Amino acid sequence: MTTTLVSATIFDLSEVLCKGNKMLNYSTPSAGGCLLDRKAVGTPAGGGFPRRHSVTLPSSKFHQNQLLSSLKGEPAPTLSSRDSRFRDRSFSEGGERLLPTQKQPGSGQVNSSRYKTELCRPFEENGACKYGDKCQFAHGIHELRSLTRHPKYKTELCRTFHTIGFCPYGPRCHFIHNAEERRALAGGRDLSADRPRLQHSFSFAGFPSAAATAAATGLLDSPTSITPPPILSADDLLGSPTLPDGTNNPFAFSSQELASLFAPSMGLPGGGSPTTFLFRPMSESPHMFDSPPSPQDSLSDHEGYLSSSSSSHSGSDSPTLDNSRRLPIFSRLSISDD
């Protein structure tokens, strides 16, 4: 009786082991596996039961232990934590090292552009805020930050507010709701608009005098003024305190020396002050800048031009030429023709 029970138990055990070995052979086939096959102990000779593999893996050991424990009535041993961890495909080996380094939620949040740009209402009303240092609003004037606004911020009236009397954006609206916002914006612009005026300096002929400096400062009230200072006489220039002293400067000349230098080239008379001639208007000395007389061929061309222009205006009233408005060169040419 005892022998029958033992043989039946061995038979069941060998059958389970053979089934497990079949699965292992299908998953990991090897060329030398047939050499390691052996007959199961206690199996019938002609039964034709499949053979088992002698090399066992941890999974087959687990099945054997589970079978033996079921026969003895003991609870089946569970897989160790390491074995179960590797049997789970969703868990990687490096996952255990990555778990402690995971970021806590909310630790790496990025502050918005409106961070600390408004006062915290609970802190202003109650003097305390449940968020503490993590609050996105300013706890006092010292934490309040300035917000960069658009250039057209608060420059136009809010249509919604002035149409229905209510704006859903409230104080955050970018348009004007009342006169106080307009006044506050205008005050801020006035402070930014005050800038120092651009100052220029003029030096007339390289020698600025006191009168020229006073005239230049009076004319430069507006930075766009480019009106030059009034022309001064030579006596003012020669008597300017900024001119170098004649005793120390070898290139300083008196009015008489200037007259002696320019008289031969300009045909100045012997008497009179040379400064009166040097600073006369051009209308009083027209021959000073006259060009040399033109040759005879240019005269003929000029006469042909006058004849053609007079014939072109034959159909209409011929214009009358005013001799006083003609240039000196043409008046001389007309005299030479006569």
Swiss-Prot record:
InterPro entries: Tis11B_N, ZFP36-like, Znf_CCCH, Znf_CCCH_sf. Residues 305-318 have a biased composition (Low complexity). It comes from Rattus norvegicus (Rat). This is mRNA decay activator protein ZFP36L1. Residues 101-113 have a biased composition (Polar residues). Zinc-finger RNA-binding protein that destabilizes several cytoplasmic AU-rich element (ARE)-containing mRNA transcripts by promoting their poly(A) tail removal or deadenylation, and hence provide a mechanism for attenuating protein synthesis. Acts as a 3'-untranslated region (UTR) ARE mRNA-binding adapter protein to communicate signaling events to the mRNA decay machinery. Functions by recruiting the CCR4-NOT deadenylase complex and components of the cytoplasmic RNA decay machinery to the bound ARE-containing mRNAs, and hence promotes ARE-mediated mRNA deadenylation and decay processes. A zinc finger (C3H1-type) spans 114-142, 152-180. Phosphorylated. Phosphorylated by RPS6KA1 at Ser-334 upon phorbol 12-myristate 13-acetate (PMA) treatment; this phosphorylation results in dissociation of the CCR4-NOT deadenylase complex and induces p38 MAPK-mediated stabilization of the low-density lipoprotein receptor LDLR mRNA. Phosphorylated by protein kinase AKT1 at Ser-92 and Ser-203 in response to insulin; these phosphorylations stabilize ZFP36L1, increase the association with 14-3-3 proteins and mediate ARE-containing mRNA stabilization. AKT1-mediated phosphorylation at Ser-92 does not impair ARE-containing RNA-binding. Ubiquitinated. Ubiquitination leads to proteasomal degradation, a process inhibited by phosphorylations at Ser-90, Ser-92 and Ser-203. Keywords: Cytoplasm, Developmental protein, DNA-binding, Metal-binding, mRNA processing, mRNA transport, Nucleus, Phosphoprotein, Repeat, Ribonucleoprotein, RNA-binding, Transport, Ubl conjugation, Zinc, Zinc-finger. Associates with the cytoplasmic CCR4-NOT deadenylase and RNA exosome complexes to trigger ARE-containing mRNA deadenylation and decay processes. Interacts with CNOT1. Interacts (via N-terminus) with CNOT6. Interacts with CNOT7; this interaction is inhibited in response to phorbol 12-myristate 13-acetate (PMA) treatment in a p38 MAPK-dependent manner. Interacts with DCP1A. Interacts (via N-terminus) with DCP2. Interacts (via N-terminus) with EXOSC2. Interacts with XRN1. Interacts (via phosphorylated form) with YWHAB; this interaction occurs in a protein kinase AKT1-dependent manner. One of its GO terms (biological process) is cellular response to peptide hormone stimulus. Residues 1-111 are annotated as: Necessary and sufficient for the association with mRNA decay enzymes and mRNA decay activation. Residues 93-113, 273-338 are annotated as: Disordered. It is found in: Nucleus; Cytoplasm; Cytoplasmic granule; Cytoplasm, P-body. The modification Phosphoserine is found at S54, S90, S92, S203, S318, S334. Residues 185-338 are annotated as: Necessary for mRNA decay activation.
